[in-house]
Amino acid sequence: MQHWLDKLTDLAAIEGDECILKTGLADIADHFGFTGYAYLHIQHRHITAVTNYHRQWQSTYFDKKFEALDPVVKRARSRKHIFTWSGEHERPTLSKDERAFYDHASDFGIRSGITIPIKTANGFMSMFTMASDKPVIDLDREIDAVAAAATIGQIHARISFLRTTPTAEDAAWLDPKEATYLRWIAVGKTMEEIADVEGVKYNSVRVKLREAMKRFDVRSKAHLTALAIRRKLI
């Protein structure tokens, strides 16, 4: 039988839109006996997901900001190479909150899995997981770490180039004034010019944009504008 990583490599080469890609990922997960798949792209504190996990679990995960608690994400950030995990097997080493997290995930058939993290552009990272409802993942053969990273690199590139719509992402918002000022920034206006056009004081524009930068945890207006455009907030 062809290994699931080989199938992912084949899928990455297929022409088509994001629907074909998402359907293909779900089919591969199902064919090889996994509960589902999850692709996470982590840009500093901004996280997007492409996954077929249960919708309720996706909502809960992002609403409660579980990425900060998730032992799999923590491990992926530090290891940067393929690993298996099991909520039950790791239980003795987990905190009370981490055990509760795994217990909650198990309600949706996520008890163990295989995760492949990779470095991506600008110092960010992506990770791809195949999850299982079994207590422990039983690998039929050893997986080459370099080959695994290469495969997920191709999946990451495919998702990026297709500008695939996330199935879930962390909450982000701009109030009306912030959105208005950022739209002006996006077309090249300075804060002084924005204040003049909008009939407000320069300091009002500066404070509003500073508040938004703090909320998005970015250090420049250019970065804030790029995030707002990417997330279709302006």
Curated annotation (Swiss-Prot):
GO function terms (MF aspect): DNA-binding transcription activator activity; transcription cis-regulatory region binding
Query: So what does this one do?
Result: Positive regulation of conjugal transfer of Ti plasmids. TraR activates target genes in the presence of AAI and also activates traR and traI themselves.
Q: Which residues form the HTH luxR-type domain?
A: 167-232
Does the keyword section mention Ribosomal protein? Answer: no
Protein name as catalogued: Transcriptional activator protein TraR
Highest taxon in the source lineage: Bacteria
Q: Name one GO biological process term.
A: quorum sensing
InterPro entries, sorted: Sig_transdc_resp-reg_C-effctor, TF_LuxR_autoind-bd_dom, TF_LuxR_autoind-bd_dom_sf, Tscrpt_reg_LuxR_C, WH-like_DNA-bd_sf
Give the DNA-binding residue ranges. 191-210
According to its UniProt record, which protein family does this protein belong to?
Answer: Belongs to the autoinducer-regulated transcriptional regulatory protein family.
Q: Which UniProt keywords apply?
A: Activator, Conjugation, DNA-binding, Plasmid, Quorum sensing, Transcription, Transcription regulation
Name the SMART domains for this protein: HTH_LUXR (SM00421)
GO annotations of cellular component type: protein-DNA complex
Q: Name one Pfam family in it.
A: GerE
Tell me which CDD domains the record gives.
LuxR_C_like
Query: Keyword DNA-binding on this protein?
Result: yes
Q: List the SUPFAM superfamilies hit by this protein, alphabetically.
A: C-terminal effector domain of the bipartite response regulators (SSF46894), Pheromone-binding domain of LuxR-like quorum-sensing transcription factors (SSF75516)
